[in-house]
Each structure stands twice: as C-alpha cells, then as structure tokens.
Amino acid sequence: MSYEGREERPEQIAEPTFENVSEHNEHDSGSAEAQVETLEVPLSNETDNDDATENAVPAEVQAPEEPKEPETVDNIDPADDDPNSVAAPKVEEKKSKKKAKDEKPLTYTTGGYLYCRSNGLIPHVMKRYFYMLEGPMSMDLLDHYYKKHFHGTLQGNPTEPSLASEQMHDSDADSLFQSANDHLNRIAKATQDCRGLLFYSKSQSTSVPSGIINLTDAVSIEPGTGNKFTINFNNGKSETLEALDPESKNTWITDLKNAIAKKKETKDKIKELRAYNDTLKRLGKLAARSGPSASETFRYFLPMLSNGRDAKKSSSKSHGGKQNNSVAKDGLFDFFQNMIKGKTPQNDTASPIDNETSADPVDTTVEAQSVEVPENETNQIPTTEEHFPATTEEVAPASEEKPATGPAEESTSTQNVEQASTQNDNGTPIGQIADAIEEDVKGTAQSVEQAFIEETDIALPDIALPDVATPTADDQDPSTAATNEESVVSNEDRTSKKAGKKHHRHHKKKKGGNKRVFGFKLHKYAKPTKSVKTLQADPSLEFAKAGFEIFPSNLSKKLSGLVQKKVHKKFDKDGRLKEISQFSKTTIKPETPLTPTTTPTPRTAAQEDPAEETTDALASAEGENNQMPQVLETEAAPSIASEGRSITVNA
C-alpha cells in the first residue's frame, strides 16, 4: 500500500497468489525453474568426486535449457570454482526478465474526488476518490473489497481446494455465481484488466479500492442538476455522483461515455480469457466455503423490512430470475430515511384482493348515481313542447316559496351530498364519518331553523290594556304564586336557551375562559340573568309624601325622610324590592301613581273623624316643642288623601 500522490504512485505489478496452481500457463515455466534450482543445490554441496560422477544425469538436464559457451583457459575464473556463487544469481535474473515481459504496468487514465451515496449499514453521503485504470491489479489490493462482502481473505488461499468444493457440481457453482456474481466478477476482471471498471477509495493516497463500479453493465450517462450526473444500468438501478465543480463534471461525463462506448469490446475480450474463467470459478468456490459477511447478509434480508416481503420476489422476477444486488442497498437507504422522517414503508404493489374490495364501493356509487339521475330528470322535464312554457312559469314561484319549508330539506340534501362526496373521494363508505356528518348537519339545521323563526316573527302592535289592579304577594294564594313562578322560570329558560344558541352561532366568547372535558374544548358562557320585574317608584312612598304636604315644611321633610329610609332598606343595590312595603296594600296602578289634586276645604263638625285627633296632636306637638312625635299612624295619611278631606290646623 503506497501513501504517495496519484501522479507519483509506483506502478502496481500484478502478483497473483495462485502461484503453484498448474492450470495457469504463466506459472508452468516457473515451476520447472524451481525444480532446476532444487536440483542444483545438492550438486553444489557435494565435494566428493565419486558422488559427482554418479550424479551426472542432473547435469544433463541443465545443459539443454542454457547452452554453455566452450570453456577456454582465458574464460575460466578462479572464483567460479564455487558453484553456489554462480547458480543462484542466474536463476533470479531469469525470473526478473520473465516477469518484466509478462507484466503490464497500471496506468491512471482519470481520477478525482466525487460525492456518492454510501452502501453501508447507515446511509450517508461521502466523499471518495474515483479513478479508472488500465492493466491488471494484484490480488493483495483486492483483498479489502473481498472482505467487505465475504468471510475470509484472498491472501490465505489454499493451494488446492478442499474435497467438498471439488465435489460441487458446476450447476451449483453457477447458481452461487448468480447470487454473488457481481462482486466476484469485478474481482476476476480486475485481475486481468481494469478497463471498464470504475474504482473508488477513501483518499488519493491509497491504492486499495473500497468499491468497484462495473461500467460494462451501464447503459447511459445523464447530467443532473448542479454538479450531479447519473449512471444508469441494465437492471434499472442508477448511481448518482456529484462533482466538485462544473468543469470536472463535464470531464467525468465525457470519460465515462467513452468507457461505456467500448464496453462491448472489453466484455468480449475478457470473457475469452481462460485465466478469467478459472479465477472466477476458484473465487466462487472460496466464497461458498467461507460464506458472505454479516453486513452482506443484513443487506440481503433488509428489503423485506423496508419494502415488504414481495420486494425480493418482484426484483428477481423483473430481471429474469436473477437477484438484483442493488435492491438491498436502495431498500436499506429508504428504510433508514423513512425511520428518520417518521414514515411507515408502503408497498408499491397491492394485492388483488385489496384492489377488488376497493373497487366494489366505487362501482356501486356510480351505478346508483347513473340510475337515480335520469329518473329525477324524467319526472321534472316535460315530455311535450306544449306544456314546456307552463312548467317554467310554475317552477319559478315554487323556488321562491321554498325557503318557508326549506331547512329540513336542505339538511337532508346536504347530508346526501356529503355522503356521496365521501364515497366518491375515498372509494369506500365510512360509517364513522357519516355519523359525524349527520350530527353536524342536525346542528346546522337547528341553527338555521332558529334563525328563520327569529327573522319571520311578526311584530304585534302595542295595544292599550285596561287598568287592572295587580294583586300583591300577600293577597295571592300560595298555589297561584307557585304556578306563576314556574311559568316565569320556564320563560326565562327559553330565553336563556335562545341566547345561548345565538352566542354559539356567532362564536362569541364570554368571561370565564374555556374548559376541557376528555380532551374536548368547551366554551364557557356567562349565565343569563333572570329577568325580574322591578317597580320604577313605590306608590306608597309617593302617597306618604303627598300626605305630608299638609304639614309644615320642616315637619314634612322629616316625616318623608323617615319613611324613605324605612322603604330604602327593602330595596337591593339594583333597585329591586326585597319585600313589598306596608304602603303597597292600596290597589292603585303602579305606572301612574296618584297625587293629591284636590285643595283642602274647611270641614264641619259633623264630618270630623277620629283621625283628626291624631293630626291635632301632631300640630300641637310641633307648635309647642317643635319635635317629631314618637308614634305615628302612617295609614292615616293615604286614607285622608284618598277621601279628599280637608284638614285644618289650629295655629
């Protein structure tokens, strides 16, 4: 392994490890030379003359291989007496000359860094050094590529295959080549000639390839967006590469197109080589004995996890029964990509049963529509031209009067339309969605009906009702009061429900925020206040004030203030009565309280009542002490005002 630059790399010389295999032609002469070398060594070690004469036969074997020049006295060297110093250098020189004739140096035609997609367990984009070579490559350099896909190494190859591998038939070997054909075929081609192969390694400083792309199986080169370009293969797969700049992209495209144009010549030339076929068979037997690597087995079975169990069958059927090794790579990449994005893998091919079940509901809906539409049209459209104008005139007012009975019909029509749309879009009737749609349609129908009723309410004219004395709470029977309260509460509930529907229809939120019940958000609306009838003014207070006008101003103010305080305690903050005051026993209209309109007239002695005594007492108390009486009968004032009597006050 060299760590020099691409331009300064030493020429890699092919050194196959199958050196002692007799089937290689280039190793036959080498084996003969090894035999000669072994024979020459004992000759040099023997010093006895008797042994030298007995072993004259091996000396004859050496004579025909290299004819010796006639020895003369001038040519003899005293140092040549020792045969060890002469025999070894000659054999090494012969080996080096033969290797120099047979070997072809590796030449780099193109090279540069490209971005590619990894074919490992974790998919990612990586930067690798790509290059193309001419000439054979050593097995030692291809050992790393072999380890990635198979167990064992190429360096420790046995000289002779085991008995089990020898007994294996050629048909079994061929079936094995179909499964691991691509990797072994690339290694066997690289040992003979690197033309038609695209290598890539981790960096420019290493000559050990980590991956090989077979350009003889490529079909075309397509330029992509940016600096990308794609290599399309016979099996339908593709390899996308990205250059660093547009110039390098153009050079790579031209070089790869030239290599693909010569693929037929290189393929025919390599297949004719006997060494290529022998190497491929030995690699197949070695791979069968060692087995695939763990990562390769994982890639082989991973498409069943990512694309389903039918992915492997479909890929093998589409390519004539042969397995496509690139399916595992793409399936692995898609599997991790879907796992990162949170998606579930979906099969491209659907079973025929699923197709049949999905097709049946669509056909039924189409047939129903095709049957129903003509019937409706035949019922509506007139058959003759004479009745045509009459029907058009009669249809128009019907369409205008339709909203009076429309909400129920509209709800049913919208429901049918929505159900039909769900069936046509999805292809299958969905019961749950239909139930939800029915509930929504019912809610909208109720809201439409409510709005329609509110809009069509007739405003009644204001009619003056006769003056009727309203009975107080004390005068009413308990049974009648209870029924009245229930009727008021029921009316208030109806009004509150209407108000709640209006708020729900307009989506107006009130105070109090929202609540969640089992995950559903519920709008919290303020409860409507109960409508309680309130009196604008207490009639008893007005009559009391009217009765106090007969007194002096100072006393009348004090009396009215006292009464007002007593009544004010019975009112709420909102002006509502807590209890009905004692002055409300009089049967008088609440809207227009009576005021004293009659002027006081002098009375006779016959018309005097006991009530005058109280007024006289009050007047005398005011005149003497100017103080407020402790006891006052308030019922006397309204009675006096109602009867219209005149009161005289003695000075």
Swiss-Prot record:
Cited InterPro entries: Meu6, Meu6_PH_dom, PH-like_dom_sf, PH_domain
Species, as recorded: Schizosaccharomyces pombe (strain 972 / ATCC 24843)
Domain PH: residue ranges: 194-261
Protein known as: Meiotic expression up-regulated protein 6
Record has Hydrolase as a keyword: no
Bias type Acidic residues, positions: 72-83
UniProt keywords, alphabetically: Meiosis
Compositionally biased spans, kind Basic and acidic residues: 1-12, 21-30, 90-102
Transmembrane segments: none
GO molecular function: lipid binding
Classification via PROSITE patterns: PH_DOMAIN
Amino acid composition bias (Basic residues), ranges on this chain: 497-514
